[in-house]
């Protein structure tokens, strides 16, 4: 990566601005998944060990009007971070700018941390954070000593005041360890993979993955398709899909992708079908590709699991984004489990999960520790897989 990183700058005695991704699920004031906080610790600890004074920025959820602030304060995150760091984390509830915040920042000593309140509280008055208001970016940049560390891969595909805005107004904008690793794993996998390189794409909609499929058909040796989008590809070929999910307006796109794929695109050969999505009374495997009338496909079937297992044999690089079925339901998780197990058993494989539901599946189904890398950013990793330039990354200082 030809951008400066946190190791390229002198941090001692400096007020260092850091964009982290603490957008974690909070229920009744309790954090239900702290993975993103844990992922930011190496960068924060490094800054503190180097004698820097860390000023952290993050958003939490969507805030459009005053009422949305309820339950969106970063207060629980400040408490959780303090426990993880084993030291006090300064935090002023409800405050994203002003004299009180400036005084607290100026009072920081080397090795101390302050977390600014949810950056999206600034969205209440004209979406200043989300629309990258130039004055807000300039103001936040003025709170530090000319160094900005972006470690929020999860928002790197967005141009916000707290990442791109600050970057434009500091002497040096550098990557943190998490951002550096995310780019190294995902971009390298796509641009310079050890081959055979197999991509696996699941999820419900073809429309979400068109750009990714197109890019990966050029870069990968094989692209395996599963999940709900299977049925749009089926229908495009005239295969019966019963009541399965389909995007009627994407049938032409699916047909064009199949033609362009030249045999690289591998579809399931059977499904696990049910007679309803939720209150079903019958679940069975289809004979072949066709889904029975009155049924809908909710997972790939056993023949598909075997076919995908075979397609993955010998793979050296695997990128997986999107589950094979409705994995949250035990009746429809065999496909996702089967594919995960097929990936991780390959000797010497570099296995990467592109965030989102696939990451949740690996964690919930106990396979997370077997993968080389699990991305913290669903949308950002998708855009990297699509070959797009991420604004948050582009805004960093060149080496």
UniProtKB/Swiss-Prot annotation:
Belongs to the phosphoglycerate kinase family. The gene is pgk. It comes from Streptococcus gordonii (strain Challis / ATCC 35105 / BCRC 15272 / CH1 / DL1 / V288). GO terms for molecular function: ADP binding; ATP binding; phosphoglycerate kinase activity. Monomer. InterPro entries: Phosphoglycerate_kinase, Phosphoglycerate_kinase_CS, Phosphoglycerate_kinase_N, Phosphoglycerate_kinase_sf. PANTHER family: PHOSPHOGLYCERATE KINASE, PHOSPHOGLYCERATE KINASE 1, CHLOROPLASTIC-RELATED. This is Phosphoglycerate kinase. ATP binds at residues 209, 297, 328, 355-358.
